[in-house]
Amino acid sequence: MQDIKINDKSPHCSKHVLPAVPSSEVYLEDCVKALKRYADNYFDLAIVDPPYGLGNRLSDGGGKLKNTPMATLYREKDWDILPTAEYWKELFRVSKNQVVFGANYFLEFLPNTRGFVCWDKKQDMPTLSACELVWTSLDKPAKIMKKSSMDLDRFHPTQKPIYVYEWMFKYCKTQENDLILDTHLGSGSSRIAAYKGGFNFVGFEIDQEYYEKQEKRFNDFKSQLLLF
């Protein structure tokens, strides 16, 4: 984060330097409607993990995940459907660059790119995917990211560890004070990673339960920072 000097004109003000705190704004709101408020190229980077009908795959009688622990932990949600063409149009309009997790579900909406990332999840469970395709708008060689998908205190079906987002920010060469967008905030891992990196952040979450849980997670994270 950038350092800023506090006002030292007052004799009662100590002359030390404090780190600038990145902004972090999150809204309980439908992201498609919200994005219409923003100008073209408003965000430096959009890093998104849109829904792809996970609830249907967990609950369908023929689904491979039906009898797994994941199926009992996460229930089907009304919003858990594939994004519309309008969503993708707005996403590309308001952001300069984009990162899309689960890209194989959305290829009809994504332009050709060489900047794919294959996330090796180091996953041993045969009923879960061993890897995930991540689409980026960057003109860079494809990479393999070897990071475990396991996360403590998991409360969202597609929750990703904070260090996965930190890796992606480095791959994208994100700069301090860049403005990050996450349209489907979920567990809030992207928000915490952005805060740690000194990036400004705007996120949207339509589900009140997840909104409240990620808010608590973020505030707990900030409280831990104050202890050191």
Question: Which residue stretches match the model-derived regions?
Answer:
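Class I S-adenosyl-L-methionine-dependent methyltransferase catalytic core
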Residues: M1-L181, G188-F228
